[in-house]
Amino acid sequence: MTQQPLPTRTEEISPTRKSTPWSRYEEAVLGFRNYWYPAMLSRHLRRKPVAVQLLGEKLVFVRSQGKCYALENRCPHRGVPLSMGTCEFPGTHTITCRYHGWTFDLSDGLCVAAITDGPESSIVGKVRVSSYPVEERKGLIWVFIGDRQPPPFEEDVPEDILDEKAVLGIRLTQRIGNWRLA
């Protein structure tokens, strides 16, 4: 059995060709998106929304009644970061944009109110921001920003991390640069 040599450049991979060991790497312009990623320490998410940028995505994390949520950090109305917003209506699992009061459901990103437009607003139920699956484990908040259904968390994260007896040493650093060269 003979093996074909691997292509040396992305352009040489035809769309009809089966994947190569490097295909996923070459296609991952902004990183490997279809995985669970640790986004922040659980203790850093309290009452106020927190902005995080991960793999080129600007996210906002919100804790509502003890549960964590992640949304796109951009109000579709004027582009204001939702991380500047507030949870105006306790118990409703929503975040409200500070600029014009558009309010989004934390579970699915759907606009549920437009405070400045009143209860008859035509945008309610029609506009949404992206929402992302979140898991909180071992003192970390994990997020899946892929373009498909997330795999079960336990199957995607190394089992050593989930071991109850394991102690995680965590260091936070911000890296700006090309992830492929890191």
Ranges and model annotations:
Residues 2-55:
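Zn-dependent metallo-beta-lactamase
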Residues 6, 40-167:
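Rieske [2Fe-2S] iron-sulfur-binding domain
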Residues 15, 29-30, 125-128, 135-137, ...:
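Intrinsically disordered, low-complexity regions enriched in Ser/Pro/Gly/Gln/His and often acidic
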Residues 35-43, 167-176:
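Short amphipathic
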Residues 179-181:
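Glycine-rich, aromatic-lined ligand/substrate-binding cores of catalytic
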